[in-house]
Amino acid sequence: MFPYPTLNYSPMAPVNPMAYRDPNPPRRRWRPFRPPLAAQIEDLRRSIANLTFKQRAPNPPAGPPAKRKKPAPKPKPAAPKKKRQPPPAKKQKRKQKPGKRQRMCMKLESDKTFPILLNGQVNGYACVVGGRVFKPLHVEGKIDNEQLAAIKLKKASIYDLEYGDVPQCMKSDTLQYTSEKPPGFYNWHHGAVQYENNRFTVPRGVGGKGDSGRPILDNRGRVVAIVLGGANEGSRTALSVVTWNQKGVTVKDTPEGSEPWSLTTVMCVLANITFPCDQPPCMPCCYEKNPHETLTMLEQNYDSQAYDQLLEAAVKCNSRRTRRDLETHFTQYKLARPYIADCSNCGHGRCDSPIAIEDVRGNAHAGYIRIQTSAMFGLKSDGVDLAYMSFMNGKTLKAIKIEHLYARTSAPCSLVSYHGYYLLAQCPPGDTVTVGFQDGANKHMCTIAHKVEFRPVGREKYRHPPAHGVELPCNKYTHKRADQGHYVEMHQPGLVADHSLLSLSSTKVKITVPSGSQVKYYCKCPDVQEGTTSGDHTTTCTDLKQCRAYLIDNKKWVFNSGKLPRGEGETFKGKLHVPFVPVTSKCTATLAPEPLVEHKHRSLILHLHPEHPTLLTTRALGNDARPTRQWVDQPTTVNFTVTGEGFEYTWGNHPPKRVWAQESGEGNPHGWPHEVVIYYYNRYPMTTIVGLCTCAAIIMVSCITSVWLLCRTRNLCITPYRLAPNAQVPILLAVLCCVKPTRADDTLQVLNYLWNNNQNFFWMQTLIPLAALIVCMRMLRCLLCCGPAFLLVCGALGAAAYEHTAVMPNKVGIPYKALVERPGYAPVHLQIQLVTTKIIPSANLEYITCKYKTKVPSPVVKCCGATQCTSKQHPDYQCQVFAGVYPFMWGGAYCFCDTENTQMSEAYIERAEECSVDQAKAYKVHTGTVQAVVNITYGSVSWRSADVYVNGETPAKIGDAKLTIGPLSSAWTPFDSKVVVYGHEVYNYDFPEYGTGKAGSFGDLQSRTLTSNDLYANTNLKLQRPQPGVVHTPYTQAPSGFERWKKDRGAPLNDIAPFGCTIALDPLRAENCAVGNIPLSIDIPDAAFTRISETPTVSDLECKITECTYASDFGGIATVAYKASKAGNCPIHSPSGIAVIKENDVTLADSGSFTFHFSTASIHPAFKMQICTSVVTCKGDCKPPKDHIVDYPAQHTETFTSAVSATAWSWLKVLVGSTSAFIVLGLIATAVVALVLFTHKH
């Protein structure tokens, strides 16, 4: 019946009965037959796979689903569109995938860093480094690890650390520390940390409370530092860290103003109830809802460390989102209001002005000033509006457009920014500052005397900011309105009489109270009636003059000004952040035209063309600095003497330049006589003139003497024979006197006569030919010989010991070279070169001084009564009570009494806001250490930038060698016992001790740090009696001694230090002082030596100097021909010290020649050069260099400089020899005449 075969196995699913089918069904596609058991196993595998990977979502279809997602958000409105794409979500995704280095840092930190828990909250961290666990001392709590929590920790309060040894099982899995900290970027939990100028910094806002104890790692995962805290420094945060030095000793580096970064919650107080400062108890306790209570809460926590958190919580506790960069910085000033204060010059005289000027700060560069007024900017009565300013129009608050505001000095100022009570403007120079505005037909202005100057940056006195130039550090007022750590003191306003609250109602004085306000009244008619009312009140007085009404305003703060009366009773103070605080920035300064430089022999001529007054400073780089300092404002030419020790000049804002003189000269010391004279005349003009005059005088005297002797001798000889007829003239006399003899005895007869009569003259007669022969030989020798060579004595630098000792000059860049010889081994070349040297004294900070600011609180006015002063702990605090002030009715305080009124005036000193960027530090300096960075090469080993201590005791490990250098031959330092550091400059200055500063001089304001409470001040502050018309606190005091010192401080040490020292800071040090010599000792390992049998043996050496310029930087070239036993390398060195060879070794073949360069100061160098174990002598003549002045120091010593060349000596000897011949001839003739005359007489 069914066309299909019967199944031999039970089916997997029941088969439904099938309907009638065509006996010829359609054909189906062929499929491979699957065995039943295999099918069951496959189905089981699929079921297990589905259970295992059920969480894996199926792959979406390729086409339609993707197309459906795109048009889905299109019909939706714009508002939901913003919600679906919040910017923080994208930033969060980026943070989830840190970089490779940060991932490694986070991995190492998570394994070796353990949180410290306090009350279940992470308060800080402890890390395991080098087998020890380190925990910040200021972080309270317990380490979240059972084994580490059980360790007994030792306290090191000087480093703010606790430490202890970790268990043995954990020592193999700890972080390793390193003392290597090259400048660059390092890693920590929050990303990159920048290390520069010996300080770790991060961008501001990165890291904070709770990060104390986290490690800073390098790229190898080694701990470089442990974070303890930080200090905000403008746009970056300086980290307080603990590091390790090269000896493994812990070093703490804490920047000024740093705070510990533990997460301990700071508590605030309100009505004897403590609460977290970021969570006020009346949450949401907003200023809008409870203004008076909020101000009271802030006043009671004025000195709290978390005052900023409390202020932010009180101002921003509402959930309404605020616009970033606008209300974020403006909302806190809604706690304050403008006020009316006294102005000494309102254009028409003294008045109570709505825009009175409280203070002007102009210590920034480029003409920026900050003005504080009694009006407010960027605020209206109903909120924030940058286009408006508000002021007190009588007793009401009024707002107008900010465009009606102006400021001027000698010309209108440019308003840069404004916020709260403050204006930031850029003004031209002037002697007064005026601020005003136009309110309809009314004009309000206030002018005060304040000198505004354009303060240029650097060493050029330009008058306008340049368009381009050089970037230099300067002080500016930041344009930001954000919190910068400076505060302005506020308080609730005092009571001021308001006549508008009083009126007559049925012959009685009625007090009208505004809605929602309170009024305090005081009446005397004749009984005293006083009280406070929140509603209208009618008194028994019948005259308005008998009552005073005061509107109580406790919902707003005002500035704590000396021009406003203080409230009655105990008043608390508040504070708000000051905008536009001074910060360190970069300013563009002018760059004077480069001087035209002219070089002559040992002379430097500068042709200067300044565009404005420009400072020129110079100094010599030797023992006597001979510093000069002059302001050049007109084109001029200056001439300076330059020696081989070096000369430095600094022109304007250009970097300093150093030059050195070379032994140059015109002519040729080895040429003809006129060339020799020209050469020495250019180098030694006076000596050459004296020498030439002496030679000329000798020649003239010799010639005259010889001629006179010869003439006199001839006359003496001939005269007797002329007088005697038929006299016989001897043959010799006839020959000498050109006389033709008629008859003469022969020679034998004459000699016989002398022998018998006078034997002395016989021997004299015999010696005459010998003398003539000697004179002829001497003249011949002077004509043909070049003169004797110079004898140069120098010490050998070779050493024959395993431990090599020597002495090298303390000059940076001048290498010390030697061949270290050891018996049985080939010589090893040794080279030590100083890269930098540092003289680091022990500096103890005595105090910090800066410009002071006189704080004048609101005075206390007591009507019809007396008040008294109370002592307060403020620097230079002055308090005085003045009686009989503000007479009846019309006085500034509106008192009833005539003479019984009193005022308590107060004033004291505090640091100015500029102290954060403009201060001087007074240090006491003691004997310090000397450090050096050296490059060492011995054999084939080369070591770069090795740090060593120059004390003769501390060895430095240089590979397998051990180097000990020092101490210096001269215990010298450029620092006096007292130095002052101002900015990047250092001054030797005898400052007064702490607590002994005098008014008007350096040290009139002293403190240990910029934030400490040990402030000392002596400013000769004196309070004066107030005038009756207005409420104010007059005073007098001495000008700032710090500002006076800045004007008269003179030249910094960097411009006058001898020996070419460069003064640097952080730490205080003198670098590269070329003073004294440095002994050294180095132990070279055996592996650096090679057996002498393994090195080539050199023979048949011949050295020839092909070209030589003496006193120049490797200006000599010589060629050495050789024969070697085998090919190889040989060190070369000149042990004589006359020449310094540039090359250290040469590669030798079996035979050939090689060329080397050398530097020498000798005109006739004759030095020995050692090649392996063989020695050859190189001789030759050197020419003078063509360049008079160069910008590099000499590479040789000046000890062997020859004063006179051999050629000059030869010409001099020829000259003197020829002159002496004339004298000898004259003497011979005189002797002959005397002999003849004597013989004739006998």
Curated annotation (Swiss-Prot):
A motif (Supraphysiological nuclear export signal) lies at residues 44-51. It catalyses: Autocatalytic release of the core protein from the N-terminus of the togavirus structural polyprotein by hydrolysis of a -Trp-|-Ser- bond. The record marks Y186, N219 as: Involved in dimerization of the capsid protein. The record marks W261, S262, R324, D325, A744, D745, A801, Y802 as: Cleavage. InterPro entries: Alpha_E1_glycop, Alpha_E2_glycop, Alpha_E3_glycop, Alphavir_E2_A, Alphavir_E2_B, Alphavir_E2_C, Flavivir/Alphavir_Ig-like_sf, Glycoprot_cen/dimer_sf. Pfam families: Alpha_E1_glycop, Alpha_E2_glycop, Alpha_E3_glycop, Peptidase_S3. Residues 710-744, 1240-1242 are cytoplasmic. Residues 83-113 are annotated as: Binding to the viral RNA. A lipid is attached at C717, C737, C738 (S-palmitoyl cysteine). Residues 1-36 are annotated as: Necessary for nucleocapsid assembly and virus assembly. Structural polyprotein: As soon as the capsid protein has been autocleaved, an internal uncleaved signal peptide directs the remaining polyprotein to the endoplasmic reticulum. This is Structural polyprotein. It comes from Eastern equine encephalitis virus (strain PE-0.0155) (EEEV). The lineage of its organism: Viruses, Riboviria, Orthornavirae, Kitrinoviricota, Alsuviricetes.
